[in-house]
Structures are given as C-alpha cells and as structure tokens.
Amino acid sequence: MDANKQKSLDLAMKQIDKAFGKGALMRLGDKEIMPIESISTGSLGLDLALGIGGIPQGRVVEIYGPESSGKTTLALQITAECQKAGGVCAFIDAEHALDVGYAKNLGVDVDNLLVSQPDYGEQALDIVETIARSGAIDLIVIDSVAALTPKSEIEGEMSDQNVGVQARLMSKALRKLTGILHKMNCTVIFINQIRMKIGMMGYGSPETTTGGNALKFYASVRIDVRRIASLKQGESQIGNRVKAKVIKNKVAPPFRQAEFDIMFGEGISKEGELVDYGVKLDIIDKSGAWFSYGETKLGQGRENVKAKFMEDKVLAHEIEEKIKAAMGLGDLMTMDSLDIEDVDL
C-alpha cells in the first residue's frame, strides 16, 4: 500500500476508534488468533464429533429432535459440565417443565442455577439479552423454542390467526443476540422440537423445526438427537440408546455423529462410553464376553464393566484420560489424530 493510502486508512481507523471504541476496526494480523473455547457435552463421543471438544463458547447452539429423545437431558448435561468448569449457567424454562430432582441427578448444581419461567416469548428473550449483556453468564439454555409464545398470541383469542409472529420474534432476537454473545463469550442453547411439513411430497426431509428459519442460519452448531433403541434389564426398560448427529458446524467439519446411552434418572452413561471407546481404541481388551485392562480383569458383560467403573472412579478416570489422549480431546482436538469413522458406534 502506498504512503498516501496508508495515511488515509490510519486516519479513518482513528476516527472509527474514537466514534465506536478501540478495536472496532483492526487488522486481523494485529491480534493473535485464539483457539475456539468449548464446553464439554458430557459425552466423549459427541465431544469428538463436534471437533473442538464440546460446543463452542460465545455462539448460538440448537439441539432438536423428536419428543423424549434426550434433548433436555443433553442440555442439562452440558449445564452440569459448564458448572464443573466454574461457569455460571441460566435455564429459561419456557415450557414450565424443569424437573429439579432429575437435573440434580445429572450433576447440575441446582442451588446456583439461575432459573426463569417467563410468561411469554418476548419476556424470555429480553431476560436472555439482559443476562447475556451482564458478562457474568457463561451458558444459557432455552427450553424450548416452541414454547416461546408471542404475547399477542397469548392475549388474543383462540380463533385469531398469528401466522409468522413467532418466526419474526426469533429473527429479531437472534439479530440482537449474536453480537452480544460473541462479545461476552456467552453460549445460548436453544432446545427445539420438530414438526412435519404440510403438503410435503417428493424429495427432501418431511421434518422441520419450529420458530422459522432464523435459528437455522444464526446457529453455529445444530445437533439432531434421536432415540434408536431401548435399553432393558430383564423386562424393565432402564434407558435409551441415542444417536446425536452434528447437522451444522461452523467451527469444525459437520455431519459427524456419536451414539451413547441415556440412563433413566442418571443421564448420559459415561461408563458405557468408556467401555465402547476403550474397546474401539484397543485400550480395553475384549475376549468373548470378558473385558480386561492390562492385567486387570474388568468383568464379564458390558453392564458389569459399567458397574465396575462406577465403583472404581480412579480406574475409570485413568481409562478416560487415555481415551481422551487417543482421541486428541486433551488439547482442543484437531481431528487429525483419529478419524471419527473409526470410533462411530
């Protein structure tokens, strides 16, 4: 760049800094590019699938799927992991259905969890904006988009037509929120439901999510959660096998997926993942129905090994660290150390 252009640019940058604050416009090379920080999901496999060791901080994340597929459980598990790392979390319970006892079982520190049960959508999103602007919150969970009912719809008659009102509300809120979240390094998780497209014929998925298209565009990560099998002990159902697929990912390659167990009353079974990934990565030896770790016999059958890990936390932690090291989760994984296809269960 010639001297006159450089002088004009420097003058313009000074004017911008004076008008909008220092750093409003800067050269990319003037600032060190930091790796994207993440919050663990509580699932080793999903942390791997997301590519950075969890969901990105300072971004919008959407978790969606059919009813009873594990959406809220996953969001609460992320909340627990964030709190364990010293973060402050808020839960916007638009559905008025938060089970405090279940959240506690998942490891959520309910005494220090900020909770709001808003009366209508605008109130919920105003609360989100206010606490995000404070800079004191690390994670906000909104359960759910479908329950963010506009005030006009609540105060109107059942016969009133309110076409597109919620979509406009979401679009306006996300336009305001994205910049604030990035600046304050606050993550917002929107839990969403799916609906069937009316008159859908031919190619493409007949499913869509509620709240319009804005969330699809503004979300840095979208996770599709589906129940794929029931886990039984004898005749009793004790949990679900769940598949989580990363449909959109702006911070790592998308379309990776992970499977894990969600046990009723307990949440994501980390012990089950230790068994599955330990075997896949040759950290745990499997011979027939028997499992062993080095010279240590772990037990016969997957459920017995899970029970062993629940009893022996030191052993479980040792194996977990080895799995994380093999996956590359120890240093904000680059995905070069292990192909997701090698560990997709």
Curated annotation (Swiss-Prot):
Domain of life assignment: Bacteria
Keyword NAD in record: no
Coiled-coil regions, chain positions: none
Compartments, as annotated in UniProt: Cytoplasm
Keyword DNA damage carried by entry: yes
Recorded GO CC terms: cytosol
Keywords (A to Z) from UniProt: ATP-binding, Cytoplasm, DNA damage, DNA recombination, DNA repair, DNA-binding, Nucleotide-binding, SOS response
GO molecular function terms listed in the Swiss-Prot or TrEMBL record: ATP binding; ATP hydrolysis activity; ATP-dependent DNA damage sensor activity; damaged DNA binding; single-stranded DNA binding
Gene Ontology BP terms: DNA recombination; DNA repair; SOS response
Pfam family, one: RecA
Residue sites binding ATP per the record: 65-72
UniProt function note: Can catalyze the hydrolysis of ATP in the presence of single-stranded DNA, the ATP-dependent uptake of single-stranded DNA by duplex DNA, and the ATP-dependent hybridization of homologous single-stranded DNAs. It interacts with LexA causing its activation and leading to its autocatalytic cleavage.
Entry similarity comment: Belongs to the RecA family.
Protein's recorded name: Protein RecA
Organism encoding this protein: Sulfurimonas denitrificans (strain ATCC 33889 / DSM 1251) (Thiomicrospira denitrificans (strain ATCC 33889 / DSM 1251))
Organism lineage string: Bacteria, Pseudomonadati, Campylobacterota, Epsilonproteobacteria, Campylobacterales
